[in-house]
Amino acid sequence: MALQTDTQAWRVGIGTRGLMFSNCVPLHLPEGQYHKLRLPVSAYEALAVARYGLVGSLWEVPAVNSALQCLAAAAPCKDVKIYPSCIFQVHAPMFVTIKTSLRCLNPHDLCLCLICVGAAILDIPLLCAPRDGAGARAAEGQAAAAKGGKLRVWGRLSPSSPTSLSLAFPYAGPPPVAWYRHYIKLTRSEGVGIGKDCAQDHACPVPPQGHASSAADQAGVPERGRKRAHEGPEAGEAASTGRGDVALSQSRALLWRGLGWDTGRGRLAPGLAMSRDAASGSVHLDIQVDRAEEGWVCDVLLEPGPPTAREGCFLSMDPGLVTMKDAWTLFPLHPEHDAVVPPKEEIHVMAQGHLQGGTPSLWGFTFQEAACDQWVLRPRVWTAHSPIKMTVYNCGHKPLHIGPSTRLGLALFWPAERSDNLDAGRIFYQLTSGELYWGRTVARPPTLTLPVDELRPWPKLTPEEPMQH
């Protein structure tokens, strides 16, 4: 009988040979020398961490995609002998057999590694888009309270990552996640007459409804903004707002309205993230774009929440935020209720309960799109203190029955500790480009080296949990 362990008893990380597992709580063993420890995750879930956490292209490498996985000892221990266990069903929980006379294993006494069988070396580069020079700091902006508990922020944006524009402003009020609705206007200013901007002359009022514009042919316009922007009489508006000395032909504007989550497109549009820096007493506003460039000024109006049931939940964290470095936690997902998904259709489901092991100080967590031969699972809306909402797509030809006993087979991981330093080991995975960014400085992380030699095809993927040997 396998010794059951829960999801919080193990820690997983990226090592030089593959995915590293170690016990983070004491493991009390029954009488006897041989023990079969059952890990709470499957090989599929563990590889999802590598694929969507740090190694964005792991399964796209043919050698890895066709290799037979093996769970083996990562660090020898004289008191514990580990017998390797091959994983023949990637959706079945992994297990390892050990031999020891100890009745209790202290934290980190048991260290395992999920590797590819063989001795050949395969270097898999982590997807990253490095930028020259030091990381950019958020531009300084200003904020003013508006009527009805609203907050107005304006100022010049600066690139804080290849895909985000940032603005920092002092604010001593309630936490910024208390706002749910937003109204964002970005103005592209070019030429020599940009010495005086919104933050200086306080003359960037939020335009009236319908007065928004888009310059689809304007160079440097964010792709997300083009899809969301509406055309309107921007010329007259720019002339009346006193936007510095910017000539009408040099000013281009984009406008977004609505909630943080765009259900039609399945991701943030344009992508609004706010976080507080306790050390400086300021709030950072990050707007996600496809390509971050200098020369944008913003005018933002934030309205208090919470949202109505019709509006749904606001995604308070950047969907690209994956985890803090070297702090991983796995979490299997089960639907909250029974449901039937028709062939080639999708439904929205909610995971059971809230995050386990989470505390109010935790800022972010994520899981990315994953698929097997029966379904495709992807996130919809999640916050650090609410149930997890998912979309399940039936890619088969028969109705798909799922329920609380169905493990959808995806790892969820989040920071083990919070840091008020916005640059402390954050890892950004850009959904649209599939690129990985390490911190605001976008430094290039090392490559992951996996041993690959014997290549055997994987069995047919199935969400069931069959017997292993």
Curated annotation (Swiss-Prot):
User: Which domain of life does this protein belong to?
Assistant: Viruses
InterPro entries listed in its UniProt record: Herpes_Orf11
* Chain positions covered by the region annotation Disordered: 203-245
Cite the Pfam families for this sequence: Herpes_ORF11
> What family does the entry list?
Belongs to the epstein-barr virus LF1 family.
General remark: LF1 is absent in strain B95-8.
Under which name does UniProt file this protein?
Uncharacterized LF1 protein
